[in-house]
UniProtKB/Swiss-Prot annotation:
Pfam families recorded: HAGH_C, Lactamase_B
Group of enzyme by EC: hydrolase
Pathway: Secondary metabolite metabolism; methylglyoxal degradation; (R)-lactate from methylglyoxal: step 2/2
Disulfide bond entries: none
Assigned protein family: Belongs to the metallo-beta-lactamase superfamily. Glyoxalase II family.
Name of protein: Hydroxyacylglutathione hydrolase
The reaction(s) this protein catalyses: an S-(2-hydroxyacyl)glutathione + H2O = a 2-hydroxy carboxylate + glutathione + H(+)
């Protein structure tokens, strides 16, 4: 379990490498991409929270696998997902579109469409003094999501959108992939000191059984080769290369 005390965001490690994020305020909590339900229910009950909403970035089973059971336990919970995902996330009851804003836990949350990994992937952005982005599988520390349904152009454009956000944005992705991503980047850029430093930082955190996520956008732009790509051609080469990395 990991904490961000500035916004009371909690990370639950589940499955092999998933992280379920929960954000609490007073006695209400929202959960992002619940791949399973048991640890979420346990945490909510232990802390006497009320589940206000479930935020779904996309339809993959390791992101929605626990949602139905959470709905059974809290029938009035809001399930927020892309309006384009009504067939694949049929239990959504708040359908949203790119650019729309919602009030969640008393804060304004903006919907940002980040296509590429899937054809209707969205992210949830909270602005302010300590901006936060729940990005699902579009961006990882040192990497980006595989392109399953979208196009290279869509993913590249999505990353450009992310880069335009405030540089102090803290980014919450849904998987602990950092070390593998950094090792791949070092294979391509073996003399890059920023990436070398990142690997040392990551290995230290992992040795202490700590998560390497979330991560700051400003720092990520220095070490993430996908964010450093100058054009679509360079991005396409990098993504194709990463797909072959073992």
């Amino acid at each position: 379990m990991e904490f961000n005390k500035a916004r009371n965001i909690i990370g639950l490690r589940v499955l092999s490498d998933n992280v379920i994020w929960l954000m609490a305020k007073d006695k209400s909590v929202v959960v992002i991409d619940p791949s399973v339900h048991e640890p979420v229910i346990r945490y909510i009950n232990e802390n006497n929270f009320h589940l206000e909403a479930i935020l779904q970035t996309h339809h993959h089973s390791d992101h929605i696998g626990g949602t139905k059971s959470l709905i059974e336990k809290w029938p009035n919970v809001k399930v927020i997902a892309s309006s384009k995902e009504k067939k694949r996330i049929p239990f959504q009851n708040v359908s949203v579109e790119d650019g729309e804003t919602l009030n969640i836990l008393g804060e304004e949350v903006k919907i940002i469409e980040v296509l590429g990994h899937t054809s209707s992937h969205i992210a949830f952005f909270l602005n302010g003094e300590n901006p936060v982005l729940f990005i699902g599988d579009t961006l990882f520390s040192g990497g980006c999501g595989r392109i399953f349904e979208g196009t290279y152009q869509q993913m590249y454009s999505s990353l450009e959108r992310i880069k335009s956000l405030p540089k102090n944005t803290l980014i919450y992705c849904a998987h602990e992939y950092t070390k593998a991503n950094i090792l791949w980047a070092l294979n391509l850029k073996p003399k890059d000191q920023d990436i070398k430093n990142k690997l040392s930082e990551v290995e230290k955190k992992l040795s202490l059984n700590e998560l390497t996520i979330p991560f700051l956008l400003d720092e990520e732009m220095k070490i993430n080769l996908f964010l450093r790509a100058k054009n679509l051609e360079e991005f396409t080469f990098l993504r194709a290369n990463k797909d072959l990395w073992v």
